[in-house]
């Protein structure tokens, strides 16, 4: 685990890094824009690539999905493809030459992901989605709403404990 919490102070203005209220309700560009953390996936993926090269790994994985494309620019297919190309150039000659970025859910909805995870026995009670933080999911933020809907659409029981 790499502690990058200090970077959040530099990326102020987001509900995820600052004292800005997390919007409630469903995902919509007008209310979820405040949850954008500029360049967050590029930052985390750059660190992951550095670690992968140091460990001689052949894969860096990320879990961006189709539902994030319209709100978060660094979750779009064009970003993922360009980032992989950039990193291949950045680490050329170091580590495993087959190192690549793996984004298996890039074109999948949350419901499709939940269905796949259900079939694989993913311990969903141990996963986290809520933007509010805390001990339990709030059930009101966009990610909690999408989580509940994804389980319902996938026909998979939702083991999540919600506050409300």
What are these regions (language model features)?
Residues 95-96, 149, 161-163:
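Short, intrinsically disordered/low-complexity patches at protein termini
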Residues 142, 150-159:
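Short cysteine/histidine-rich zinc-coordinating motifs and their immediately flanking basic loops
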């Amino acid at each position: 685990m790499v502690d990058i919490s200090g970077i959040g102070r530099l990326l102020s203005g987001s509900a995820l890094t600052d004292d800005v209220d997390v919007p409630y309700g469903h995902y919509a560009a007008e209310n979820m824009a405040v949850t954008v953390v500029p360049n967050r996936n590029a930052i985390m993926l750059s660190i992951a690539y550095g670690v992968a090269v140091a460990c001689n790994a052949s894969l860096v994985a990320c879990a961006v999905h189709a539902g994030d494309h319209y709100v978060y620019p660094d979750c779009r297919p064009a970003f993922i493809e360009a980032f992989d190309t950039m990193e291949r150039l950045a680490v050329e000659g170091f580590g495993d030459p087959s190192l690549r970025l793996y984004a298996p859910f890039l074109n999948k909805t949350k419901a499709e992901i939940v269905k796949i995870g259900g079939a694989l026995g993913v311990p969903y009670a141990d996963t986290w989605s809520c933007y509010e933080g805390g001990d339990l999911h709030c059930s009101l933020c966009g990610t909690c709403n999408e989580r509940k809907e994804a389980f319902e659409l996938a026909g998979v029981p939702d083991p999540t404990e919600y506050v409300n």
